[in-house]
């Protein structure tokens, strides 16, 4: 029989959890018994709403505003999580920016900012939670990445594709290094997911959507709950033999 609360007693930090995929993850983790840290970088209102929803459902949650591209802010967030709940057992890195630009049009600052948000943020979070996980001999690190990390599918996304490939490599390196300490590290690559994204960025949004559906074996766009369920599997004892994926 499946445990209805497989994360009972665990503490999870989920970055970018004020909306969309991150919100679905943090709410599912709470329903599974975890204490959760809801993070946002710009909208306090969204973070507070998610925290209120979780508390109304009987869960334990705090909201922490922090720019995940700022190493000091991430360190302070993890410290607040540990001070509040005792430790951090699960860390989900779920922040990404994406913009269509030809490589010759990307400024050095835009390149560096994208790398910092999409790739460095995963490192900033991992370096802070790993000591806590090593102390307990148990930990789960999950990166929300993207299919761009496997192959370059769309032109004008050079900076994003580079970051996603880096995130995948980072997870594999973490898995190799941290496995003996009881810590797993994996990526989840959502693909086409229904979120609040602006579909108007595409020249023909409906044509693009139909083409994506046709390329997906199950013939539908994914939901945020699909991604949250995958993360829940990796975050519990069920994911204990999966690492470096």
What positions do the PLM features span?
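A glycine/serine/threonine-rich, flexible loop-to-helix segment
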Residues: 3, 48, 105, 155-157, ...
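C-terminal substrate-recognition "lid" of short-chain dehydrogenase/reductases
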Residues: 85, 123, 138, 220-245
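Substrate-binding pocket helix/loop in short-chain dehydrogenase/reductase
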Residues: 102-103, 110-115, 208, 212
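Alpha-helical segment proximal to the catalytic Tyr-Lys
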Residues: 131, 176-177, 240
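Catalytic loop of short-chain dehydrogenase/reductase
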Residues: 142-166, 171-180, 192-193
